[in-house]
Each structure stands twice: as structure tokens, then as C-alpha cells.
Curated annotation (Swiss-Prot):
Changing residue 83 to K: In dim; impaired dimerization and oligomerization leading to increased nuclear accumulation, but lost ability to activate as-1 elements-containing gene promoters (e.g. This is Regulatory protein NPR1. A motif (SIM3, required fo binding to SUMO3 and subsequent sumoylation) lies at residues 345-348. PROSITE patterns: ANK_REP_REGION, ANK_REPEAT, BTB, ZF_C2HC_NPR. One of its GO terms (biological process) is protein ubiquitination. A motif (Nuclear localization signal) lies at residues 537-554. Keywords: Activator, ANK repeat, Cytoplasm, Disulfide bond, Hypersensitive response, Metal-binding, Nucleus, Phosphoprotein, Plant defense, Repeat, Repressor, S-nitrosylation, Transcription, Transcription regulation, Ubl conjugation, Ubl conjugation pathway, Zinc, Zinc-finger.
Length: 593
């Protein structure tokens, strides 16, 4: 299915109409004179010239580029000052200022920091490349595959969040770089879809159109009209839009005779306390008995607008219905899916949130997460020892929740088992979680936060030795050793470890399968035996061992590289980092032999 946004395919061609002169003297692109009429050969020559300039921009070797545009995530886009200065008055001024700064600071290269140029709206790498390619070639590229498409296979990718985000980012950059013809094009694209997007995305479009001001008046007026007639509540308006825009919307609602319900004082106080991350104040307000968390939609508010810790702390009070719906018909899980925060989704599911609940429009939390996540992000399987992208994690968690009823849940280890068996269980759990932290850091961190691992005491070999538990000192091999017994201080750690592993198996089966493969003790034990094995069986075992060894090598090489880099930048912290590295090896030395 062709997922190209309408209008992009045609805009990638140069025709005589593409160069009709206008009276717009603010354009960064030089136009032909009005009396000039392009013939067939002229068009072909311009296409060839455009292709040549574009190939220079796309050259993988930077092709004599002498400046860089630095994005907020640290990535850099190389470009040629002579080209951008000739094509764009904005870049001509910006680069002249950057060169003066370079000369005064004796820096090696001219760099423009995008966060200093485009401060009001976050933009991504692909939109930056699209706009710069336009400045080079005067042609609008189609969106990169998977960037303007969501992860929902049933979506037509016209008005989903990735498609809207890409258009907004290009529009904003065109506004910042003063490219009016690109503003006109993308404003038209957004006007075509603004009636099809969900109302939450309309708020985002309205905010950006307001930033662009007069350059996007048609889009601004249309978004205002939609929001005025919508049922978007005051809290959402105040948290999403500038104060003057909120006032204008309220005034227009009153003029039309529409009801404008005010937020109750006691509800507002709860929200203000949450904004201040003050859970204790929330408790005091609830004791006054003027409102409760459900009536105030406090959990919805915290999940949507507060930091993750505040939202999870509020959830731990167990005073709110996790399946309660707000006036828009959303459950808390729906809101968490919109925010794309894995830890919040995990916390809500653990507290009993239903993933099967649908919005008034018929969307489940999984559908919301998919439609908010780029296809390229969701299809990108993360490498081991690398952090996973949040959007993909959210989709993965919610997909597993859909299958949960078909999968039997693991029973946490009981304390009423043989001492030696319990000891080995503790060591296995500790090793498994330590290995998960190395191979799948993002997934492990999310599970550990929910399992409340922080604050529990780590199990190490010396902490489980009978000598330490009894307080005696071994003086000879003949001294009788007291049997292992678990201390009360270790029980919380055991529960947290078990919970972490359970969450991993429940929500991250992809990661758990790799850990199961490594933690399979029988597999490793058999590698040490087998005198009567056939040559084929020995080869299979050798291959199996090499697979496990390679996985472990990769994990530790990443860890050592990180520690090495840290030691170069901070000699003081290198000592503590080295200690951390030894600690990691010690944890993995718990493995049975």
C-alpha cells in the first residue's frame, strides 16, 4: 500500500510551474523573473542541476562540507556554507555570526546549534534533512519510509501521530529558516488532515500554528474553530496551550453560548499539589474530604503531566480506580499509552488496569500506542546491551498483556523449601537480573522500578556464607559449618528479584528467551561432560558454548568500554567505576559450576 502523504510525490518533480515568480521577496529560494518562460530543455537542465546539488548534500563522505548543524540529541548534519549562504538569507546571517564566534574562540569547525535556532518546538533528524535537502535542490522529498507512518498495520497513515509530527516539524523548520513556499505547502497538507486527527493532536497543531503566527493564519484559525466547538476540558487546554490562546477559546465558547465548566477549587488544589510533586500535600487535601482522586481525575492528571515518580507514588496510595474514565472517556492506561512511558504502563497493569478497555472512538491502549509510535521505531529490534526506544517498549508491553491470560504466571519462590535449594534460587535470581541489566538495560530498569528493587540489599556470595550469618570465624577445615538460613533483611530482596523476573517474563518474552538460554544450567553442565559423545554432538555443544560466550563477551565489552570512557574524563570517579565493574563480575560469579 502506498503510504506517501498526499501531495508529496508530485512536489518532487521540477516543472515550469515550479518556477513561476512571485512577489514574495522574503523567500529564501531565488526565483526566475516573471517574464522568463521555461522550455523543455530548460526544465531538463534545472532537473540535472537540482540532482547534482542534491547528490552533493547526500554524499556519504561529507564531500568537502565545511559546517555542521548539531541536533538536540547530539547528531550532526554536515552542509556546505557556500551553498546555504547563497540559497538562504537566514543561513547567510547565521553562518556569518557563527564564523565570527569560531574565529574568536579558535574552534576547528563552524557549527550551528539547532536548539539555539529552533527553541520553541522539538524537531527530529529526518525533518531537518528533508528541509536542508529542499534548500539544496528546490525539491520536496517524500517522507522517509517508516518515519511518517505509525506501527498500526490497519492505519492509512494520513492523520496518525507520526504523520502529523513529521509535517509539523518540517513546517516549523520552514518557518525558522524563512522558506515561505515550504510553509505554504505543509500548511496545506495539515489543513487537509486537521479534521481527521484526534482532538489531542489538534491541540498540538494549534500550538505550533500559534508559534508560526501570521505565516500560518489559515491553519491557526481552523484549529481554533475545531477546539472551540470540541469538548476539550479546561485542564487540557491550560496544560497544552499558552494562556492568551486559552482565554481566546473560552471567550469564543461563551459567545457561541457553549458551556464553559470551571475546574472546582478542591480539584484544582489537588492538581497544583501534583504539579509540585507533593504527594504528602495530596494526602492532606484528601483528608479534608472535599474530593477524591477519582472525582479529581488525579491519576489521569499525574500520568499525563507529572514526572514518572510522582505518578507512581500516587498510584501506590491505592486510593484511585485505575480503570476510571475521565470526561473524554479515557482510562488512565489510555493516557499512559499516549504519553509513551513504559514504566507508567507497567505500573498500571500491575495495579489491575484493563488493556481491553476502549475509548469512545473504539481505540484500546494498544491501538493508541501503535498509532503514536513510528513504524521504523517499532520495527527496529534493539541490539543487546543497548537501550530500547520507549515507543517500541510500550507496544511490546501492551501486546504481551493481550496474551497474558493464555500464559501461566510464574509462582514466586517459597521460603518453605530446603536451605540449599533456596540459596541457589537466590543466586540464580541475582545473576539473572544482573545479566538482564547488561543485555537489556531499558527493559530491566523498567521491571526493577516496578518491583521496587531500590533500597533492597544485594545478595553477594559473602553475605550468604554461614560464617557471616553465625558471626563465627573458620579456623580449620574441620570446623562444622552452620546450615544456610535466610535473614529477614534478605526477604525483601528475594521478593523484588522474583517480581523483576516475573515482570520480565510477562512483558518482555523476547528478552527472557535470551536470558533463559544463558541461564540454562543443564546446558552448561553438559558441556563439561560427555566423554562418550559423538563428534557431531560435541560440535553442537561447542557451538552452543560459543553462542553463550559471545553474548557474555559483548555484554562485558560494552560495560568495560563505558567504564574506560568514564575514567578518561574523570580520574576521581574512575576508581569508583572500577569498583562497580568488579562488582558486576562478582555478581556473575554466583553461577553454579
Amino acid at each position: 500500500m502506498d503510504t506517501t502523504i498526499d501531495g508529496f510525490a508530485d512536489s518532487y518533480e521540477i516543472s515550469s510551474t515550479s518556477f513561476v515568480a512571485t512577489d514574495n521577496t522574503d523567500s529564501s529560494i531565488v526565483y526566475l523573473a516573471a517574464e522568463q518562460v521555461l522550455t523543455g530543455p530548460d526544465v531538463s537542465a534545472l532537473q540535472l542541476l537540482s540532482n547534482s546539488f542534491e547528490s552533493v548534500f547526500d554524499s556519504p563522505d561529507d564531500f568537502y562540507s565545511d559546517a555542521k548543524l548539531v541536533l538536540s540529541d547530539g547528531r550532526e548534519v554536515s552542509f556546505h556554507r557556500c551553498v546555504l549562504s547563497a540559497r538562504s538569507s537566514f543561513f547567510k546571517s547565521a553562518l556569518a555570526a557563527a564564523k565570527k564566534e569560531k574565529d574568536s574562540n579558535n574552534t576547528a569547525a563552524v557549527k550551528l546549534e539547532l536548539k539555539e535556532i529552533a527553541k520553541d518546538y522539538e524537531v527530529g533528524f529526518d525533518s531537518v534533512v528533508t528541509v536542508l535537502a529542499y534548500v539544496y535542490s528546490s525539491r520536496v522529498r517524500p517522507p522517509p519510509k517508516g518515519v511518517s507512518e505509525c506501527a498500526d498495520e490497519n492505519c492509512c497513515h494520513v492523520a496518525c501521530r507520526p504523520a502529523v509530527d513529521f509535517m509539523l516539524e518540517v513546517l516549523y523548520l520552514a518557518f525558522i529558516f524563512k522558506i515561505p513556499e515550504l510553509i505554504t505547502l505543509y500548511q496545506r497538507h495539515l489543513l487537509d488532515v486537521v479534521d481527521k486527527v484526534v482532538i489531542e493532536d489538534t491541540l498540538v497543531i494549534l500550538k505550533l500554528a500559534n508559534i508560526c503566527g501570521k505565516a500560518c493564519m489559515k491553519l491557526l484559525d481552523r484549529c481554533k474553530e475545531i477546539i472551540v466547538k470540541s469538548n476539550v476540558d479546561m485542564v487540557s487546554l491550560e496544560k497544552s496551550l499558552p494562556e492568551e490562546l486559552v482565554k481566546e477559546i473560552i471567550d469564543r465558547r461563551k459567545e457561541l453560548g457553549l458551556e464553559v465548566p470551571k475546574v472546582k477549587k478542591h480539584v484544582s488544589n489537588v492538581h497544583k499539589a501534583l504539579d509540585s510533586d507533593d504527594i504528602e500535600l495530596v494526602k492532606l487535601l484528601l483528608k479534608e474530604d472535599h474530593t477524591n482522586l477519582d472525582d479529581a481525575c488525579a491519576l489521569h492528571f499525574a500520568v499525563a503531566y507529572c514526572n514518572v515518580k510522582t505518578a507512581t507514588d500516587l498510584l501506590k496510595l491505592d486510593l484511585a480506580d485505575v480503570n476510571h474514565r475521565n470526561p473524554r472517556g479515557y482510562t488512565v492506561l489510555h493516557v499512559a499509552a499516549m504519553r509513551k512511558e513504559p514504566q507508567l504502563i507497567l505500573s498500571l497493569l500491575e495495579k489491575g488496569a484493563s488493556a481491553s478497555e476502549a475509548t469512545l472512538e473504539g481505540r484500546t491502549a494498544l491501538m493508541i500506542a501503535k498509532q503514536a509510535t513510528m513504524a521504523v521505531e517499532c520495527n527496529n529490534i534493539p541490539e543487546q546491551c543497548k537501550h530500547s526506544l520507549k515507543g517500541r517498549l510500550c507496544v511490546e508491553i501492551l501486546e504481551q498483556e493481550d496474551k497474558r491470560e493464555q500464559i501461566p504466571r510464574d509462582v514466586p519462590p517459597s521460603f518453605a523449601v530446603a536451605a540449599d535449594e533456596l540459596k541457589m534460587t537466590l543466586l540464580d535470581l541475582e545473576n539473572r537480573v544482573a545479566l538482564a541489566q547488561r543485555l537489556f538495560p531499558t527493559e530491566a530498569q523498567a521491571a526493577m522500578e516496578i518491583a521496587e528493587m531500590k533500597g533492597t540489599c544485594e545478595f553477594i556470595v559473602t553475605s550468604l556464607e554461614p560464617d557471616r550469618l553465625t558471626g563465627t570465624k573458620r579456623t580449620s577445615p574441620g570446623v562444622k559449618i552452620a546450615p544456610f538460613r535466610i535473614l529477614e533483611e534478605h526477604q525483601s530482596r528475594l521478593k523484588a528479584l522474583s517480581k523483576t523476573v516475573e515482570l520480565g517474563k510477562r512483558f518482555f518474552p523476547r528478552c527472557s528467551a535470551v536470558l533463559d538460554q544463558i541461564m540454562n544450567c543443564e546446558d552448561l553442565t553438559q558441556l563439561a561432560c560427555g566423554e562418550d559423545d559423538t563428534a557431531e554432538k560435541r560440535l553442537q555443544k561447542k557451538q552452543r558454548y560459543m553462542e553463550i560466550q559471545e553474548t557474555l563477551k559483548k555484554a562485558f565489552s560494552e560495560d568495560n568500554l563505558e567504564l574506560g570512557n568514564s575514567s578518561l574524563t574523570d580520574s576521581t570517579s574512575s576508581t569508583s567505576k572500577s569498583t562497580g565493574g568488579k562488582r558486576s563480575n562478582r555478581k556473575l560469579s554466583h553461577r553454579r559450576r
